[in-house]
């Protein structure tokens, strides 16, 4: 079923199979009349609003790589330190980490293996929230690790050491869900936690003792039932809160919630599977607490609310009102009533993928459903599409009454670890200036793949044309013209200082069967003579010792301002980068030599990184210091202990920008991560980040910062795209195996704080693969454009412009 048509289906008269909705409801009603406790009500009419590009929400990446966490698990948000602003706590395999979004600060609470369930609650009555969660400990007999429940108290400052207290040292399994509620009606809240992924799953309640540092009183609610999605609320109106867990609800014995007597199990949603998210709220305003439920680990999950009739019609205590389907791994669910508008809202968020090797969900959605008439009709507002989230929570960021949504990515396509990133979705009042970009095919029949793309005024008319592969495209008609005798153009520079740029290219290998085998390092430079007749003047530079140049830079690098070309080769492990020195007579061969014995062959930039007046070379993680006598001394800029950079060639594309405003040039980078093994053939999520200039590149390594993690990013560009005086970053994804099916994205990033710790991400396109593209250029006066191309989508040359 096409989920985008589901809103129409709910309001229509037939299902996708041609069965009248009334018949479906009648059939369901008949089945429950034979013993099931839930009746099937009318499908609520859902009106869908806010199509792609019109929604004024933006995504902020608060942390692309949470420290010490190899697999993100759960999260919670509240004012932990009493400053009136919201903190976020995220847990996972490796650590508990706290964040202060208002200042972009973060810190470590504890190291260890944590799961999904986490809650924030004032345990000791001091007015500040503590962290409650579960972690593993070694089994003393050498068996599998055991789970315990514990809570953490901060010092006077969140950066001070936190103290751990164990509340249950003998749990049955992983506490996937945690929530607090008043189960015994004494005005104090108790903990509810389930046990999952164990031999004997169950659900348990814990009462906080007078001294919460001691073990807590434990009550079994149920054992043997597998269920996820725990919430609490007074369902039967007795003044005590009951527990909902998946498709069941549980009521305490009359003797009391912690009397030791068994709790009673009731059926709530018999047609729903066990793995759910739930929320309790009075949907229709009749004074009774209803239940919202969504199936969370399925690609065909259903969302519904169940009308509470426990007291009115005890023989049929629940009426099911379907809301939406299919929802794809919707592992986030929240419900609330707006204090101002009195509208009731449900927020559902889909994951990137479910567990157990589920198919990837490239179009994951975050959706807000609202009703003004007690659940009779609903509006569906698409908050965000194309970004999966897990265990998302809603919170007032700074006490202003404006709520944001915090979440984290889960089940992303990583090579070895499930490192998710921390998200904040925030309303903006109006759509972003980046929301409406138009795409144009410059070429959709280019004969073969280009290895780079450039904007160069070829014909001298004052407009930047586009050069890609062995062709140039005239602006603005984009007619394709050949550059004769050339395999690829790799650079453009005004070599003879006549005010127009010449092109540097490589010759094609004669008789090659395809473009890749035709690549060489036979370098030439070209000058247009009569472009109306495709006449060019060609001069040899020389042949490099590598296979073909995958990165290069050109500038006055040598004593006296002499020009030189530096090339890094695709087979960098065998051929270090070389420098080609311009002769006095440019028509002669250029002298070549190895510039530095480093294993790098990707993008290079000539830039005075150390501020001494001489152009250095930035080569990925290396700084090649210009010594002023024609020699260049290599310095590694980052600590190789970072796993992402064990292969230093993993840094693929770079740009120079003063990110944090300290006046020093920093290095933006992307990391290519592709596995060409026939048994794998995947493009993995890899970092986009920046290296902070510490002031002395030759003496001190740069500080590493992550912006985001996207699919094998192999394209980067920078420019003031929105005209506000600040520089934005453009990044394109690169999936050479499944470019169409995997929906490669083109993103714009804008700093969300002045220091560049957090970044807002704006999707521009989700259709094309990018390789050495995403260049920010000015194709017409005062109008910024983005040009790009792909590796496998060889026929395409693209341009994006606003409007």
Language-model features: where?
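Beta-propeller-forming repeat regions
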Residues: 4, 30-803
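N-terminal export signals
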Residues: 5-25
């Amino acid at each position: 079923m096409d989920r985008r048509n589901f809103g129409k289906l709910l309001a229509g008269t037939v299902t996708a199979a041609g069965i009248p909705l009334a018949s479906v409801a009648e059939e369901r009603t008949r089945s429950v009349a034979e013993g099931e406790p839930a009746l099937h009500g009318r499908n609520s009419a859902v009106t869908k609003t806010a199509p792609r590009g019109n929604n004024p929400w933006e995504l902020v990446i608060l942390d692309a790589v949470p420290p010490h966490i190899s697999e993100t698990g759960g999260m919670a948000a509240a004012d932990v330190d009493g400053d009136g602003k919201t903190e976020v706590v995220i847990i996972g395999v490796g650590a508990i980490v706290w964040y202060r979004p208002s200042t972009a600060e973060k810190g470590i609470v504890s190291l260890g293996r944590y799961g999904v369930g986490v809650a924030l609650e004032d345990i000791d009555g001091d007015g500040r929230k503590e962290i409650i969660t579960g972690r593993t400990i070694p089994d003393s007999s050498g068996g599998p690790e055991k789970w315990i429940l514990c809570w953490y108290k901060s010092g006077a400052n969140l950066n001070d050491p936190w103290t751990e207290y164990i509340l249950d040292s003998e749990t049955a399994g992983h506490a996937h869900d945690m929530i607090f509620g008043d189960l015994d009606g004494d005005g104090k809240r108790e903990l509810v936690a389930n046990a999952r992924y164990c031999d004997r799953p169950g659900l348990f309640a814990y009462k906080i003792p007078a001294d919460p540092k001691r073990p807590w009183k434990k009550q079994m609610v149920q054992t043997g039932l597998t269920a996820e999605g725990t919430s609490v609320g007074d369902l039967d109106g007795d003044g005590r809160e009951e527990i909902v867990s998946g498709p069941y609800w549980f009521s305490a014995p009359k003797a009391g919630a912690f009397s030791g007597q068994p709790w009673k199990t009731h059926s709530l949603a018999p047609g729903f599977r066990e793995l759910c998210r739930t929320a309790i709220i009075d949907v229709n305003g009749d004074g009774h607490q209803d239940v919202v439920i969504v199936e969370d680990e399925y690609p065909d999950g259903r969302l519904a609310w169940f009308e509470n009739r426990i007291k009115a019609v005890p023989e049929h205590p629940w009426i099911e009102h379907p809301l939406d389907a299919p929802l794809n791994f919707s592992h986030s669910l929240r419900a609330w009533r707006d204090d101002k508008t009195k509208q009731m809202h449900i927020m559902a968020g889909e994951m990137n993928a479910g567990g157990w090797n589920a198919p990837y969900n490239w179009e994951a959605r975050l959706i807000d459903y609202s009703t003004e008439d007690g659940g009779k009709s609903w509006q569906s507002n698409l908050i965000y599409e194309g970004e999966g989230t897990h265990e998302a929570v809603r919170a007032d960021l700074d006490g202003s009454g404006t709520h944001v949504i915090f979440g984290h990515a889960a089940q992303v396509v990583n090579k070895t670890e499930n490192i998710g990133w921390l998200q904040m979705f925030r309303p903006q009042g109006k759509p972003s200036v980046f929301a409406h970009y138009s795409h144009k095919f410059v070429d959709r029949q280019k004969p073969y793949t280009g290895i780079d793309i450039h904007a160069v005024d070829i014909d001298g008319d004052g407009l930047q044309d586009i050069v890609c592969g062995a062709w140039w495209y005239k602006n603005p008609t984009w007619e394709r013209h050949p550059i004769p005798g050339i395999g690829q153009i790799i650079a453009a520079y005004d070599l003879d200082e006549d005010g127009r740029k010449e092109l540097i290219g490589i010759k094609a290998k004669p008789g090659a069967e395809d473009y890749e085998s035709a690549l060489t390092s036979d370098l030439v430079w070209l000058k247009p003579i009569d472009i109306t007749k495709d006449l060019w003047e060609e001069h040899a530079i020389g042949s490099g010792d590598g296979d073909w140049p995958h990165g290069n830079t050109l500038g006055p690098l040598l004593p006296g301002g002499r020009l030189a070309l530096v090339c890094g080769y695709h087979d960098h492990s065998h051929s270090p980068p070389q420098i080609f020195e311009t002769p006095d007579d440019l028509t002669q061969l250029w002298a070549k030599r190895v510039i530095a014995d480093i294993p790098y062959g990707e993008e290079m930039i000539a830039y005075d990184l150390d501020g001494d007046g001489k152009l250095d070379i930035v080569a990925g993680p290396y700084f090649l210091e210009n010594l002023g006598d024609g020699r260049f001394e290599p310095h590694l800029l980052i600590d190789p202990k970072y796993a992402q950079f064990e292969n230093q060639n993993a840094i693929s594309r770079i740009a120079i920008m003063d990110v944090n405003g300290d006046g020093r040039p920093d290095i933006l980078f992307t990391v290519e991560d592709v596995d060409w093994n026939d048994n794998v053939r995947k493009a993995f999520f890899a970092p986009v980040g920046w290296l902070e200039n510490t002031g002395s590149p030759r003496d001190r390594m740069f500080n590493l910062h992550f912006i985001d993690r996207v699919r094998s990013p192999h394209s980067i560009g920078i420019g003031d795209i929105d005209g506000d005086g600040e520089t934005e970053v453009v990044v394109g994804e690169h999936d050479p195996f499944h470019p169409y099916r995997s929906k490669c994205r083109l993103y714009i990033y804008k700093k969300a704080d002045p220091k560049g710790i957090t970044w807002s991400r704006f999707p521009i396109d989700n259709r094309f693969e990018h390789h050495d593209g995403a260049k920010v250029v000015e194709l017409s006066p005062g109008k910024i454009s983005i040009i790009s191309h792909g590796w496998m989508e060889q026929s395409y040359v693209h341009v994006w412009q606003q409007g």
